[in-house]
């Protein structure tokens, strides 16, 4: 069985996120596979706890996570530590309209993947841009993968051009520090002074 869940924050356009969620669920259901959905948008700790209990009762071999809006990585980090199963994230492409993004789901996926990679858990994501055929193809590829967890990150390394290696700003006595602790779920803000 493959578990499906959706992450969101109420500070974003929840109505728009729910519309994307319904469309994506319908595409997933058309694949005629053994899927089980946690129906509620996971928007807070209490709903997150309910999702954990739901998937404890409904054993899954893989998970599809719909990153409906931006979220921090708090829930998904604890979810992965608990279940340790392959995950495919789906983010939603949205047009820039000159202001704040309505969903900003790709940024949520980026934060989640960074947190997971720091904990040596490698995953993948796809961006759904209203092309049902491509989404179905990518979902089937994930479903049919024979191995359980990727052993490495598949992001390509890029080289820095020599033209950009010159100093842009020169500091006489540079200092870097951190005041307080990072917010929970924002592992990208970790600081190591060694």
For the regions a language model picked out, list residue spans one by one.
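An N-terminal assembly and electron-transfer interface module characteristic of large anaerobic redox
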Residues: 1-194
């Amino acid at each position: 069985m493959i578990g499906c869940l959706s992450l969101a924050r109420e500070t974003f356009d929840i109505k728009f996120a729910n519309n994307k969620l319904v469309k994506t669920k319908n595409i997933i259901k058309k694949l005629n596979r053994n899927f089980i959905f946690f129906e509620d948008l996971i928007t807070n700790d209490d709903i997150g706890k309910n999702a954990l209990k739901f998937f404890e009762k409904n054993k899954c071999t893989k998970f599809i996570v719909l990153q409906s809006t931006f979220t921090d990585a708090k829930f998904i980090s604890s979810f992965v530590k608990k279940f340790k199963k392959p995950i495919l994230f789906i983010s939603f492409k949205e047009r820039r309209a000159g202001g704040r993004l309505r969903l900003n789901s790709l940024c949520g996926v980026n934060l989640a993947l960074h947190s997971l990679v720091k904990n040596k858990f490698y995953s993948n994501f796809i961006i759904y841009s209203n092309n049902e055929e491509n989404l179905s193809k990518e979902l089937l590829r994930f479903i049919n993968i024979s191995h359980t967890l990727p052993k490495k990150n598949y992001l390509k390394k890029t080289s820095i051009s020599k033209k950009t290696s010159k100093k842009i700003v020169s500091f006489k006595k540079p200092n870097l520090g951190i005041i307080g602790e990072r917010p929970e779920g924002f592992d990208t803000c970790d600081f190591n002074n060694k």
